[in-house]
Each structure stands twice: as structure tokens, then as C-alpha cells.
Swiss-Prot record:
A GO term for molecular function: magnesium ion binding
Organism expressing this protein natively: Proteus mirabilis (strain HI4320)
UniProt-recorded name of the protein: Crossover junction endodeoxyribonuclease RuvC
Family: Belongs to the RuvC family.
List of residues binding Mg(2+) 1: 8, 139
Gene name tied to this protein: ruvC
Amino acid sequence: MAIILGIDPGSRVTGYGVIRQQGRQLIYLGSGCIRTQVPDLPSRLKRIYAGVSEIITQFSPDVFSVEQVFMAKNADSALKLGQARGVAILAAVNNDLPVFEYAARQVKQSVVGTGGADKSQVQHMVRSILKLSAAPQADAADALAIAITHCHFNQNLLRVGDPRLVLTRGRLR
């Protein structure tokens, strides 16, 4: 059983999603957005750091998963996104969480089945996978999708030297 925190970083809106993995079952614990209303970037970064730290304290996740920075058409936007991502990762590292990174196309492929999926498709599949009554807001859905992707990619994560691993039918389990 593991609690996974997914983060969809943004300099104005940072989405978060928390799920628990119990075997093959994924259980929704919470999601939302950290909104930064202040105009200056340093204050926004401070709010993102504080918000992510608060979420970590509230949910006590075992793992932190975050979307990788993609190349934006606007270099200034990409730099701001990278800074927002950096303070979110810093909050995780300061709380001794392992950090895992996933590309946006990888997340969409994992959750929807195609790397070119749009936001509404991601929202729909997150709702379906986690059995939610309504689709989460786009940024929160992206964060939940990142957490789901971590579960998919690490379902059979091998820990070298783990004495509990047993070779069964050609697979380490």
C-alpha cells in the first residue's frame, strides 16, 4: 500500500492529486489546485512551496510524482514553469520523499491510451479509473493522472536486493 502525490506544476495554478494504491486498486484521497493570485513570481513560488508542503503534511504521501517540463513556444513561460516545478520538488525533497518524473505524453498514453489526448479525455479517464462521481477540474485531473501513471509504471518496480522478491513463472514478484 502506497500513497502517491501527483503534481501538475504551473506558475499560476498548480494541480495536485493524491491516491492510494492497494494492490491493483487505486483509491482517490483528494485533489485540488494551489492558486497564486499575487502578481510577482517570487511570491507565487513561495505560495506553491507552502501549498505543496501543506499537502504533504496533510496526506503523508510515500511518493512524489511530477510532470516533466516540456518545451513551450514562449521561453519565458517555460522558465516560469520550471521554477514552479523546482519549488514543488524542493518541498518533496525537504520532506524526504522520492521524486519520480513523467513526460506529458507518457501520462496521456498511460491514462487514456494515446499520447495525443486532450484535457477532456484525461478528465474523463481519471474519473472512470478512480470511480469519481464527477470529473475533476483540469489541473487536478492532470495531477491525478500523473499519480496514476506512477502506479502503472511502478506496479512491478524491482528493488535490487529485496529478499522478498521471488521468481514465479519467469517474473520477479
